[in-house]
Design a protein with these regions (language model features):
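Conserved N-terminal glycine-rich FAD pyrophosphate-binding loop of Rossmann-like flavoproteins
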Residues: 46-79, 258, 269-272
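Glycine-rich loop(s) and the adjacent beta-strand/alpha-helix scaffold that form part
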Residues: 215-271, 438-461
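Residue-level detector of alpha-helix initiation sites
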Residues: 23-24, 47, 141, 223-224
């Protein structure tokens, strides 16, 4: 029997859920939990407004069709499935695409300053993988505007009292309590394996504490820093995902890592130049003569090779990111036709991204944010000179495996406790940390959408799970939480004190640099099994060397050195999942490309990679498993739900190839035509 009192436990404590992560996925999960009258503890490693979502530039997709091009959620679904090379389950994609217009209108009502047309309508730009203007945007700082808008809604709930079962406010209890500068260490698992709380560390005073929760959502972003230099923030280590993976959570499609085609090369950090630059008319080119010494503006059209337009005339500069990155990589690495550097007399790994043919006032209105970044860090005026760019690790399509429940028509059963649930009962995932929506390649501007939609789905699912609980986590014995807290405190003390007498200790930052260089060089755009064996051997070497790390900073406050050692141990765990998954998948699909296996192999590999932790140094890959959700046993296999869009070969040379509807052909979907919104999913 489910617990009757959903506000207080039998001991009188307020029954809270926990959300870990203050980005778009986490904030939307908090909002939907509060709307379901579930009090929340929100944990964030950094101040919420510094979450990595703030870095997103280009926009958010929604098939509103204000330009009368014939776009629709059905086309959006087809192009997302096609762009992901049919590695994503299609019902969650359908739910996301159906809900997208309502999400954008909701954000508009929240005050997001979207760009508008002269008529006052929301403006939309084109992004990669589509021929439609589908991407709503707020200049070139869309992520920041969305993050601030959702945080304002969460702050509103920080002032709302928790009411008891009689509608009386409980003194000192608010619907949301925000704990910033806390680092997630692990989940607290009950005797039955269910998640009943977390252990976290206060980075201000380094105290370790266990927190109870009826249900927990991890919304902690991607693992980009595993690759060293990337477009990701330094906080994107994947440490929370690795921690719960270590505890038994299954990791899905870890090998699917997106490399963005246009970033500013740098020795320390690769700074993103958004796809919106190409969406607003930017063109990628190199000189036809590999030894051309002229300045780019002195090179006439006839002497330029517009690489993407030549190779993919159907979509041109707006082919999906995996295809654009491989084309640029081929041009620079295999053909040695990158921009010629007269000082070094060699061709650099750079191509031109040119916006100089566009009106400056137009560019300042649409792209000022990213062009200011280029001017600041490259020292060149992008309004008058083409930008020099090269691909960079950007996003993880893989992540924590999470479930969904579909109905007979292919839509999600909204409110099902299975939606966004990991295989650990009570533990949910939302945002880049989950694997759910993008398959083997993410379309540009689907990331902000998937983060928000995942939160909208996770919140009601967590509320349903909580309602079905036979007993609250707040009624479990204190010894369970004390044991988990002691385990993590001992682990931290181990890091502080280890190798204190070692004569030649290792440096965690040097080890991370070696890991990043190895992963970036050998596990990104092109992959080779023999080289991946060397990557795995290197990870094994680093697993041994990390045990000899000595922390030089033993401060009792803000000890980032000790924290980084813990994060490095977790990064090594996920690095192995990524590299081993890449070695196992002997085909080319989306962002995963092996020249030795250049074709997609649906017969053997149209399935989810399911990785389960065994011990340090090994990964177990499984084809099926069972887990318990809200008292019901669920059987899961690695098969992909392709019931809505029939798989076919990707051919971006042909305009409109991504969508049967866009070509005017009969859709292969067995489901009825999609509407402009998901009637079951309440969007406020």
């Amino acid at each position: 029997m489910a617990s009757k009192n959903l506000v207080r436990s039998s001991s009188g404590a307020v029954r809270r859920a926990i959300v870990v992560g203050g980005g778009l996925g986490g904030l939307m999960t908090v909002i939907k939990l509060c709307e379901a009258n579930v009090p929340v503890l929100l944990f964030s490693l950094v101040p919420v407004k510094r979450s990595h979502s703030v870095c997103a530039q280009g926009g958010i997709n929604a098939s509103v069709n204000t330009k009368g091009e014939g776009d629709s959620p059905q086309v959006h679904l087809e192009e997302t499935a096609y762009g992901g090379d049919f590695l994503a389950n299609q019902p969650p994609i359908k739910g996301m695409c159906d809900a997208a217009p309502g999400i954008v209108f909701m954000l508009d009502r929240m005050g997001v300053p979207f760009n508008r047309t002269p008529e006052g309508l929301l403006d939309f730009r084109r992004f990669g993988g589509t021929l439609f203007h589908r991407t709503a945007f707020a200049g070139a700082t869309t992520g920041q505007q969305l993050l601030y808008a959702l945080d304002e809604q969460v702050r509103r709930f920080e002032t709302v009292d928790v009411e008891d079962e009689h509608g009386v406010a409980i003194p000192g209890e608010k619907m949301v309590q925000k704990l910033e500068s806390w680092d997630f260490l692990s989940a607290v698992l009950g005797d039955d394996g269910a998640c009943v709380g977390i252990v976290a560390q206060d980075m201000k005073n380094m105290s370790v504490r266990a927190f109870r929760a009826d249900t927990v959502c991890v919304a902690t972003g991607g693992p980009g820093i595993i690759f060293g230099r990337s477009t990701n923030s330094v906080i994107c280590t994947g440490t929370a995902a690795a921690a719960v993976y270590r505890q038994g959570a299954i990791y899905g499609n870890g090998e699917c890592i997106q490399v963005h085609p246009t970033a500013i090369p740098g020795a320390d950090k690769l700074r993103l130049i958004s796809e919106s630059a190409r969406g607003e008319g930017g063109r990628v080119w190199v000189p036809k003569d590999a030894k051309d010494k002229r300045q780019p503006r002195d090179i006439p059209e006839k002497d330029r090779d517009y690489v993407l337009e030549r190779m993919y005339p159907g979509y041109g500069n707006l082919v999906p990111r995996d295809i654009a990155s491989r084309a640029i990589f081929k041009t620079c690495y295999h053909e040695h036709r990158g921009i010629f550097n007269e000082k070094t007399s060699k061709n650099e790994n750079e191509v031109y991204l040119d916006l100089t043919h566009k009106d400056e006032a137009f560019l300042r209105k649409k792209l000022a944010g990213i062009l200011e970044i280029y001017e600041k860090f490259a020292g060149v005026d992008p309004y008058k000179n083409p930008m020099k760019v090269f691909p960079a690790v950007h996003y993880s399509m893989g992540g924590l495996w999470c479930d969904f429940e579909r109905d007979a028509k292919g839509s999600l059963v909204v409110g099902s406790p299975r939606n966004q649930s990991t295989n650990l009962p009570g533990l949910y995932a939302a945002g880049e940390v989950d694997y759910q929506y993008h398959g083997a390649n993410r379309l540009g501007a689907n990331s902000l959408l998937s983060c928000i939609y995942a939160g909208m789905v996770a919140g009601p699912a967590m509320a349903s799970y909580r309602q079905a609980m036979p007993a609250s986590a707040f009624d479990l014995p204190a010894s369970l939480f004390e044991k988990a807290e002691k385990r993590e405190r001992d682990s931290y003390e181990r890091i502080l004190g280890q190798n204190s007498n070692e004569k030649s200790p290792e440096n965690a930052y040097v080890l991370h640099q070696e890991l990043g260089e190895t992963m970036l060089r050998d596990c990104t755009i092109e992959r080779d099994n023999a080289i991946l064996d060397k990557v795995l051997a290197k990870i094994g070497e680093l697993d041994d060397r990390v045990k000899r790390v000595r922390v030089t900073d033993t401060a009792s406050r803000m000890n980032q050195g000790a924290q980084f050692v813990r994060h490095l141990e977790n990064m090594l765990l996920l690095a192995r999942v990524i590299a081993q998954g890449a070695k196992n998948r002997d085909e080319s699909r989306g962002a995963h490309y092996k020249p030795a296996f250049p074709k997609r192999d649906d017969a053997h590999w149209m399935r989810t990679t399911l990785a389960r932790h065994k011990t340090v140094g090994s990964v177990e890959y499984i084809r099926a498993f069972d887990y318990n959700c809200a008292g019901k046993s669920v059987h899961i296999t690695d098969e992909i739900d392709i019931s809505l869009v029939k798989p076919r070969e990707r051919k971006y040379e042909q305009a409109g190839a991504a969508s049967a509807v866009a070509q005017g052909a009969t859709t292969t979907s067995t489901a009825p035509p999609a509407t402009t919104g998901n009637a079951k999913l309440e969007v406020r």
